[in-house]
Amino acid sequence: PITGFKAGGTGIPLLKKLKEKEPFYASVYKHNIIKNNGNIKINKYTLGIELEVGYKIDKKFFNFKKKISKNDINKIILKIFPCIEVVGYRQKKKGIKSFGDLSSDFGGNIKFVIGTEKKLNNINVNNLKTVIYNKKANQSVKGNTNTVYKNPKNSLFFVLKKLQKSKIKFNNNFYVFTGSTVGVVPILKKGSYIGKIDKLGIVKANIN
């Protein structure tokens, strides 16, 4: 079953490079959600690892009679959390020329590791420092939440508007993953990847 949605292609430089006007979104299935400190098997089609802001959204969103506005968003956010995403395809790609290439094959090998969920409590996600690292590989990549389609909440708003437009509905609370704050980081070595987002905390994935 579908348990959430992911915004993809949220980096402004990527949007400009591919001459796209907006990101895309894709469904996320329950079997692809893993608890913090979980294990992920990778294969030759794995592209890399990402660090992003995730939200748990109240199912009452689906009962909105009017178009959702930015003022409505805080009312339906149940939790916020750091998330590691492992990105992959079902088959080998020779490069990305459009979001069609990405979205047509998204979701095959993707896993999402969810960090500790917190209440929103007026946490401003517009400009938070982020870092993902693997000590064993001596690898560390820094980022910022402001690289995600202006900011993660704006990316969330984009996904919610698309869901309303497509008239998707179901009876459960759901996740929205807003896009990478560090780009796609190559997995140099198996072992523990730890992601940290200021104010949100730490998320850990064991790659094997």
Predicted regions: what they are:
Residues F170, I187-L188:
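Short, well-ordered loop/turn sites that connect or cap secondary structure elements
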Residues T181-V185, K199-I202:
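Short, charged beta-turn/beta-strand-edge "cap" motif at the junction between a beta-strand
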Residues K66, K161-S166:
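A short beta-strand-loop-beta hairpin characteristic of the jelly-roll/cupin
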Residues R90, I168-N172, V176:
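A short, charged
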Residues P1-N151, L156-F157, K189-S192, L200-N208:
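Catalytic-core "active-site belt" of small-molecule-metabolizing enzymes
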Residues N154-K161, F174-F177:
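Short, structured beta-strand/loop micro-motifs enriched in basic residues and often containing a Trp
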